[in-house]
């Protein structure tokens, strides 16, 4: 096992973990970190993280069928993922990707798909019901003195049932969380961050992206297109608070 001095970002299964524009997260990181090494782990590859310690592991949204494939592909490396999570290695799962981390996915017909069991929650897939909203939340980052506001969109077929001990990714001021009955959105365990927010997340959230870059050791890296990104961010902080905004998506 090796630890890299250079920033290495592993993007898992980009050939299908790219739904709803979620591949824009990796695209934006490339723009922010032109000198970093990006490793795209595809379906037939042994993950880089199996023998190395990447600076960041990124997995984005995918279809229900590809969730099943992803669980099968990652299952042999489950204990390695536990080791990396416990060591505080940064990981970001966005869109529907967090659903592979739970204990199981309950399908519309009542059948169950066992998941990786890295986090204590159950996913209930309710196709054809669709849940959508806009979100403004406060990032779960207790080490910071000032709150980081996170914005994004939610478009999903699922509602999550979380165990009592889980910590959220953020606590929503606007929009629903893991399900319609809670404002707690996503999960955080050490530096594993899992969120259903899309947009994509990183180009929509300069303050969170700054936080993530600092977390992976890139404190001096500038945010790409910062003026435009911040203007968009500030506009969403205003418009997402308008009554009825969630009904438009």
Feature names for model-found ranges:
Residues 179-216:
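A glycine-centered loop/beta-turn motif at secondary-structure junctions
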Residues 6, 53-54, 87-89, 111-114, ...:
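Short coil/turn connectors at secondary-structure junctions
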Residues 64-65, 98-100, 159-161, 201-203:
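Glycine-rich nucleotide phosphate-binding loop and flanking beta-alpha elements
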Residues 63-141:
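Cysteine-nucleophile active-site neighborhood
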Residues 56-60, 92, 194-196:
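Structural motif
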Residues 109-185:
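Pocket-forming structural segment of enzyme catalytic cores
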Residues 9, 95, 198:
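Residue-level signal for inorganic ion chemistry
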Residues 1-86, 203-249:
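N-terminal beta1-alpha1 cap of cysteine-dependent amidohydrolase-like domains
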